[in-house]
Amino acid sequence: MFNTHKVEIEWGGRPLTIETGKIARQADGAVLATYGETAVLATVVSAKEPKPGQDFFPLTVNYQEKTYAAGKIPGGYFKREGRPSENETLVSRLIDRPIRPLFVDGYKNDTQVVITVLQHDLENNPDILSMVAASAALTISGVPFMGPISGARVGYIDGEYVLNPNIDEMPESKLDLVVAGTSEAVLMVESEAQELPEDVMLGAVMFGHKSFQPVIDAIIKLAEVAAKEPRDFQPEDLSELEAKVLAVVENDLREAYKITEKQARYAAVDAAKAKAKEHFFPEGVEETEMLAEQFATIFTHLQAKIVRWNILDTGNRIDGRDLSTVRPIVSEVGILPRTHGSALFTRGETQAIVVATLGTGEDEQMIDALTGTYKESFMLHYNFPPYSVGETGRMGSPGRREIGHGKLAWRAIHPMLPAAEQFPYTIRAVSEITESNGSSSMATVCGTSLALMDAGVPIVRPVAGIAMGLIKEGERFAVLSDILGDEDHLGDMDFKVAGTEFGITSLQMDIKIDGITEEIMKVALEQAKGGRVHILGEMAKAISSSRAELGEFAPRIEVMNIPTDKIRDVIGSGGKVIREIVEKTGAKINIEDDGTVKIASSNGKEIEAAKKWIHSIVAEPEVGEIYEGTVVKTADFGAFVNFFGPRDGLVHISQLAADRVAKTTDVVKEGQKVWVKLMGFDERGKVRLSMKVVDQETGKEIVAEKKKEEVDAE
């Protein structure tokens, strides 16, 4: 019934298995991949024909984690998986980026890649395995995919590169780098690092590329026995038509790309396009020598060619800069004085408003991952409204691109944040992109660094980011610093590097062509370092280190520690005690399992009141000390007084006053505030209190006062 094929190799000290022919047989390609005991299923389906008029390649990658893979049941009312989590979105992008450039130019059939995590051993992260499975499924599917690719995770532990470190090893690693590519070239890099130098980062990329070669060989081996017949797809030869369009638009496009201002340049390009359309699609003529979608493809190709020719031939870029110059930078902080921290970062025609907000433990984000639930105390959200590029568009929940750019900036900033013990705040940074002409994610990195320093967050060092580009024709190449949107779109590489003056904290690379050598990457990293240091210098003109004090409107947090066996006393039955403390004092309180108590309020008096209350609950009252209390009950034999938090003690009728008392209520009433001295404990451990030895006006011990008077008289 099943015609199965299976290939198994040893990779990074664990068995990797790729198998096809048994599951999802109606898909164009389906591969079940296992690494250790983590298992994923990758499927590929591509439409037989493109939709009429389609002028782009509609590829969708969906990575989905099923909670049953880790032996869990989803939370929530419906008890089933819902919309994609942030991690699922990020892994979907991670797989999409290296496979997209490898589809044959001109292929426009609707294509969907679905990767499902079926089993998680809680040791091997499924993201790399999913990339391998997707590549294998595409390779055997028959669609025009010029792979295979593979990916690998590289760690850096004790000065050594580690291939695919398991989940428990990652906290020890100074690097979390994912690299993907073909047997010849690197196509994609995504990483977070602890201020590592350029040569270590480049070494990690090359180590990863070398390490995944056995996986590519395994996929080829599987394809040799299991691949479907390649689809009969021949890319259109548009060279003759392209030459005709070039003759009409070359001069206009060359002039348009001399205009440095973005909107004016776009208007000139649109005018050139409209002129060419009139030439090739005259009004009233039904039969034309090319289709509208062919013209659109050709025009885009010609835009790229002219920009690339100009850069390689003259060394001058669209906006007149040379290859390594960064656009003018203006940095401002404190632009929104009522927020906790704010910054406006402008670089050329790219601009971001970043606002930092400080919160308490209650504000931490609860993340329910396959590996378990954990709290995240640093959030960075990136918003890209359509007005930032002068357009109208959809507003609403963040798209994949916004989530991806936010995470890239998060990775850049995260290594420089203070430890929770030093700064016990939850931090949220929000980047609003108000203008965009390339590299808005790196503007977010710079703006976030400024806003955090403005908020008084003691980051280790300021962080800046820069986006690099590449134009390569044959042996000639040019590396571009601080690329524009057009240079990103029309170039061969998008290479984002963020870090401090001492090293890299985040690196993201997407390459659209084969043949990016180690030499080119080395040039790009060195050029990026110069640009990064320049940007840090410009940022320092606004603020160079974190403010010594938090902003006026930021909450204050004080930390105290209590014995773990007293936690239940502070919380109370059903949370009764802690709710009362919060309601009466106005402070926010968060208690950790280890007895760490964080008390937050913008009012110092509220913090002190809460601290005093909690201290009264967890501390033991001392014999001989005087305490303020409240009468909670009266009886014939005396009064019960609540003192020192939840403790009650008895003031015997003989201890109510110096004179003889006939009736308790002659001296005290329920609810009355009184001063009491702790005299000791009776044989049953009950608290014995006295009022008569304490001056009820001053709270001072009467005996002590008399002794003092006697001493003064002498």
Swiss-Prot record:
One of its GO terms (molecular function) is polyribonucleotide nucleotidyltransferase activity. The keyword Methyltransferase does not apply. Residues 555-614 form the KH domain. Its main location: cytoplasm. The keyword Glycoprotein does not apply. It is found in: Cytoplasm. Pfam families: KH_1, PNPase, RNase_PH, RNase_PH_C, S1. One of its GO terms (biological process) is mRNA catabolic process. Keywords: Cytoplasm, Magnesium, Metal-binding, Nucleotidyltransferase, RNA-binding, Transferase. Its cofactor is Mg(2+). GO terms for cellular component: cytosol. It catalyses: RNA(n+1) + phosphate = RNA(n) + a ribonucleoside 5'-diphosphate. InterPro entries: ExoRNase_PH_dom1, ExoRNase_PH_dom2, ExoRNase_PH_dom2_sf, KH_dom, KH_dom_type_1, KH_dom_type_1_sf, NA-bd_OB-fold, PNPase. This is Polyribonucleotide nucleotidyltransferase. The gene is pnp.
